[in-house]
Amino acid sequence: MREKITLECTECKQRNYKSFKNKQNDRDRIELKKYCKFCNRHTLHKESK
């Protein structure tokens, strides 16, 4: 089943992106490099609750 997740910037802690993930395939927390409009650059975003 696909579940809603929120991606949080690791530097400024802003929650910038929402997405879905399949819990059966991805049990770990997702980490992606995405653009943060508050930092004005690409930063690592981690899955948060």
UniProtKB/Swiss-Prot annotation:
GO terms for molecular function: structural constituent of ribosome. PANTHER family: 50S RIBOSOMAL PROTEIN L33, CHLOROPLASTIC (PTHR43168), LARGE RIBOSOMAL SUBUNIT PROTEIN BL33C (PTHR43168:SF2). Belongs to the bacterial ribosomal protein bL33 family. It comes from Natranaerobius thermophilus (strain ATCC BAA-1301 / DSM 18059 / JW/NM-WN-LF). InterPro entries: Ribosomal_bL33, Ribosomal_bL33_sf, Ribosomal_zn-bd. One of its GO terms (cellular component) is ribonucleoprotein complex. GO terms for biological process: translation. The gene is rpmG. Keywords: Ribonucleoprotein, Ribosomal protein. HAMAP family: Ribosomal_bL33. It holds the Pfam family Ribosomal_L33. This is Large ribosomal subunit protein bL33. The keyword Ribonucleoprotein applies. The keyword Acyltransferase does not apply. Disulfide bonds: none annotated.
